[in-house]
Every structure is written in C-alpha cells, then in structure tokens.
From Swiss-Prot:
Pfam families: Hydrolase_like, IGPD. It is found in: Cytoplasm. GO terms for biological process: L-histidine biosynthetic process. Residues 177-365 are annotated as: Imidazoleglycerol-phosphate dehydratase. The gene is hisB. This is Histidine biosynthesis bifunctional protein HisB. Its EC number is 3.1.3.15, 4.2.1.19. Keywords: Amino-acid biosynthesis, Cytoplasm, Histidine biosynthesis, Hydrolase, Lyase, Magnesium, Metal-binding, Multifunctional enzyme, Zinc.
C-alpha cells in the first residue's frame, strides 16, 4: 500500500464538543458537533484519508461504562456517514494517565501499523486536535499539527489552509513572490521564509507561544504562507527574540514583494469586535510608524505587551513602510490579537497584484 495523505483527527473538543464539567460524552444529550466540521470534512475527503485518534479515560470501567460511550459515539458516526464522511480507522486508548500505557496520546503505539507499514505521507499528513498532546503526537510522528480552536483556528480555516494550492505564477508576472531571510546575532538565530502567493500551514517556532500565535494570525489574515524559526536568549527576556523576528520578517516581506510593480501599495482596515483596531499601511519605501494603544497588564502569557509596539515599529523599518496602528479595548489579549489581525488584513490588500503598473507617479518605490 502506498503512502497516503492522512489526517489523524482527535474526537472530543475537535470533531465534537467536549463537556467542561466531566470531559465525557456519555449520553446523546451531550453530543454536539463543532461548528462547520461536516462542510470542512466534505471538502477535505477527496484529498485526505481520515483516521480518528482519541483518548477516552477509563473507558469500559465503572467510571465510564462502554455502553455509555457507544450510544453517542455511534450516533456521531451515523451522522457523519449520512453526509458522506467515513473514517478509515478509529483508534481509541481507554487508559487513564496514571496507567502509564504506551497507547495514550501523545505516545504512538496506537499508530504503530501506520508507522511500520509507512501508510501515511509525512509531507502531506497532519494531526488535528485541540490539545498540546495532539501537537506532541504530530511531533512524535514527524508530521505537522493543526491545533484546533473554535475561534483562532476553526474548521473553515483548517480546510482553507489544507486545500489552498500554491500559485506558481500569479497573474503571469514571472517568478513567484518568495523570499528567505536568515539573521544571526549573539542574541538570536532566525530564519524566515515567506510565500506571498500561496496560503497553507505556517510553521512558526520562536519559543514564545503567544507570539507564535500572533505571527500565524498575520500570515493567515494576510493570505500568504510563512515559516519562522528562532532560537533566542529567552533566559534573559523576550525583547531580542521579538525585535529580531520583526526585523527579519520585514526584510523577507520586502524581498518577496520585489519591485512592487502591479501591487495595490495601500491598505486600510477597521475591524470591529470587542476591540476597535485600526491599521493603515503604505508600502512607500519610506519607513514611518505611529502607534496608539494602552494595555492593562504587562504580560499575555509569555509575551510582554510593551513589545507589541516595538514589533510593529521594527517590521515597518525593514519593510520600508508607513504604518499607523491603534486599538481600543479592555482586554490586552484581544487588543494585541486585533492589531496583528488588522495588520495581516491590511497587508493582504497592499501586496495584492492587480496589474503591471508601478503604483507611484515617480515611477519607482
């Protein structure tokens, strides 16, 4: 059997809602599908094989009788089948963490057949799940993970990431807009790679979890793909890592955009959610930056909120762009996320190719 593109998909919290009370789906009343999971799987099924992989603590014991599991589980499968969605395999670990078994995710014994017989294509297979253990499972399998989240990475976004094909020659203008920038100092060792004309799965690892998520928001909302890796002096603080990634990313974007012929050049967005974020961008060739925001705490996770301004200032400097950013709101997490999303959306407008003209009366940018 040849290697196949495969999605190893978690069940509770990914395909169906996981109750936060007891984390067990043991009745039909608790069965609730995640939003748009069925339309997404219908789009994905022609490209990928589906394998369900799930930890079910104490399944078959008094704390979780088999019959209590079977009824909602079989109902879930019946709904999927009625819509044309089939799982090639369903792999379940019934053990609790304290049992120290070899099959509980993120361990890989459940998937031994797929590993030994090389049944999945490592270059085009993914683990989809809502927990860090799903991400670790992907690492143990040598493939990539998509950590599902109903707001930050929902099923619509997952389907878009997995199905967006590379655009080898956008608008017939020649080479694809791609760049690689490596930057090494005493404090950081960074590599940034961007593909402006394709979207897909971004591989980002800076050692700062919240920052990784924010960088992914730029690419996702910008409609492009990027890989970012950084080893920095986080034992001191996060300053050098965030600043140097911004400098490298700005340089990579500038290089990928190239001579700017045919681009829109300008972008402006004003998204309204619980926060009001405003972003205006001009790929002018002249760096200028203005920022207005107040945060009510010093940290979001392991990310210093004061570094938000410094990140965008640094990216404007190496991108050679005029950038205005502001946000109003009460929640620092939401404020910062709104800024990164707004920047991504604005960048999406500015780098879009519409013709072959130089967007400047001077004839050069």
């Amino acid at each position: 059997m040849t290697q196949q593109p495969t999605l190893f998909i978690d069940r509770d919290g990914t395909l169906i809602d996981e109750p936060k009370t007891d984390f067990q789906i043991d009745s039909l009343e608790k069965l609730k599908f995640e939003r748009n999971v069925i339309p997404a799987l219908l789009k994905l099924k022609n490209r990928y094989r589906f394998v369900m992989v799930s930890n079910q603590d104490g399944l078959g014991t008094d704390s979780f009788p088999q019959e209590d599991f079977d009824k909602p589980h079989n109902a879930m499968l019946a709904v999927f089948r009625s819509q044309g969605i089939e799982f090639d395999d369903i792999l379940i670990c019934p053990h609790k963490p304290e049992d120290n078994c070899d099959c509980r995710k993120p361990k890989i014994k459940l998937l031994k057949k797929y590993i030994d017989k090389k049944l999945f294509d490592p270059a085009d297979s993914f683990v989809i799940g809502d927990r860090p253990t799903d991400v670790q499972l992907a690492e143990n399998l040598g493939i990539r993970a998509l950590q599902y989240h109903p707001e930050n990475l929902d099923w619509d976004m997952i389907a878009e990431k997995l199905l967006r094909e590379p655009v080898a020659d956008p608008k017939g203008l020649g080479q694809p807009r791609h760049a690689v920038v490596a930057r090494k100092t005493k404090e950081t060792d960074i590599k940034v790679e961007v593909w402006l004309d394709e979207a897909g799965v971004n591989q980002i690892n800076t050692g700062i979890g919240f920052f990784d998520h924010m960088l992914d928001q730029i690419a996702t909302h910008g409609g492009f793909r990027m890989n970012v890796s950084c080893k920095g002096d986080l034992h001191i603080d996060d300053h050098h890592t965030i600043e140097d990634v911004a400098l490298a990313l700005g340089a990579a974007l500038k290089e990928a955009i190239g001579n700017k012929r045919g681009i829109q050049r300008f972008g402006f967005v004003l998204p309204m959610d619980e926060c009001k974020a405003e972003c205006a961008l001009d790929l002018s060739g002249r760096p200028y930056f203005k920022f207005k925001a107040k945060f009510n705490r010093d940290k979001v996770g392991d990310f210093s909120t004061e570094m938000t301004e410094h990140f965008f200032q640094s990216i404007a400097y190496t991108l050679l762009a005029t950038l205005h950013l502001s946000v109003k709101g009460d929640n620092a997490h939401h404020q910062i996320e709104a800024l990164f999303k707004a920047f991504g959306r604005t960048l999406r407008q500015a780098i879009k190719i519409e013709g072959n003209e130089m967007p400047s009366s001077k004839g050069v940018l």
